[in-house]
Amino acid sequence: MVTPHHACRRLPAKRRLFAPIGLISCLALLASCGTLARTPYTAAEAARPEVLDVAALRYFADDPIQSLDALRPRATVNGEITYLALSGGGADGAFGAGFLAGLSDAGKRPEFSAVSGVSTGALIAPFAFLGPQYDQKLKELYTSGIASSLAQGGGPLSILSTSGPFANHRLERLVDRYVDAQLLQAVAAENAKGRRLLVVTTNLDTQRTNIWDMGRIAQVGTPDALTLFRKVLTASASIPVVFPPVAIEVEAAGHHFEELHVDGGVTSPVLTLPETFLLRERRVPGSPINMYMLINNEVDRRFEVVQGDTKSLAVRSASTLVKVQTRSTIFDSYHLTRRNNFKFNLAYVGSDFREQATQDFSTSFMRALYRYGYEKGRSPSAWVHQPPPEALH
C-alpha cells in the first residue's frame, strides 16, 4: 500500500513543493463545508427580537435600569435578596461544585433567591439553583471523567468548522444528557415562587452581554423551551474556537433569523449586577442584597515561564485576560455593596491549591480541585468578606 508519506517522497521536487499547498486547499475546502449559513438582518432588528414568540425571556446588561427591574427576585430570605453569582473557569468549575457540596454537608448553605452563571458557572447554575439534592449530579459532571471528553474534539478540523461533521459538538451532547424535561419543570416551579435563575451569553453579532431568564424559559414548558434552555447553557460555556457558536432563532417584525451566541465570559466573567447598576453611584432600590460570589478560578497572579509555542501563548493570554476582568468585577461588586450597605461574600481558588492540570479537562485535576473546594466549603471560613489581598498586588 502506498501511504501519503511514501507518495510524497516519490514526487518530483517541484511537485513536492506544491504538496503542502494542496493539503491546505483540501483543509480549507473541508472546513468550508462546516461554515454556518447566515440570514442577513439589520441592527434595528437586532435591538430586541423575540425568542419562542414570547416577550422578556432575555435582557441585556446595558439595558436601562427600569427594564432590568423584571429580573429582581420577589423571593427574599430574612428580608434580603440572597444572590449567588457563579463565574466562568472551564475545568475549574470543579471547585464550585465541590464548594457547594461542602456547604451543604456542613449545614450552612444559604437559600438563594437568585443564581446567575457564566460559562462553566452556567453549567453549575441550574443545579445550584435547585439545591443540595442536586449536589451528586454536579459531582458526577465534574469528577466522573465525562467532562474529559470535551477535550477530545473533532481533531484539527474542528477548530476550522462552525457546523457540520467536523465541529466539536461534545459540549452540546453533555448538556443534553444532564438537562431534561424533569429539570426544566423543577426550575419552573422555583421560578413560580419568585426565585430567579439567570445565565449569560455573548451575542457575537451585536457584541452585547445577554442575560437569559432561565426560569421564565422553563415556565414556557414546551419542547422548544427545553431546546432553548439547553442552547443557552451550551452557548454560555462555548469557548470560542474550541466549541462552535450556538445559533438561536429569533424573530423581529415577522423576520426570522438566527443570532450567534458564545461563551458569556467573553463579555462578562461573572454576573453580579448588570453594568447599569455597577457603574451608577446612587443606591440600588428595593430589598437589600446579600451577595455571594463563587469564583471558579484563581484571582492572584501566578508566575510561570510560558512556553513559546502558539497554544501556550494563546492559553496564557486568555487566562490573563479573564483573571484581570474577574478581579475588576470583584472590586466593582465589592464597592457597590459598600455604597449600598449590602453584605459581600467571596470564595475563590486560593494560592494554596498547587496541583497543575497535565491536560485540558484532566479528570485527576478536577477531582483534586473538587476535593479542595469541598473542604473549603465545609470550613468555618468558607467565605471572605472583602477582595483578596492577592488581588491588590
Where are these regions (language model features)?
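Intrinsic disorder/low-complexity signature
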Residues: 2-3, 18-19, 50
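Intrinsically disordered, low-complexity regions
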Residues: 9-10, 23, 35, 165
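C-terminal motif of bacterial Sec signal peptides marking the signal peptidase cleavage site
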Residues: 29-32
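Patatin-like phospholipase
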Residues: 34-114, 129-393
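Hydrolases whose catalytic domains are alpha/beta-hydrolase-1, hotdog thioesterase
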Residues: 124-127
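N-terminal secretory signal peptides that target proteins for export/translocation
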Residues: 1-15
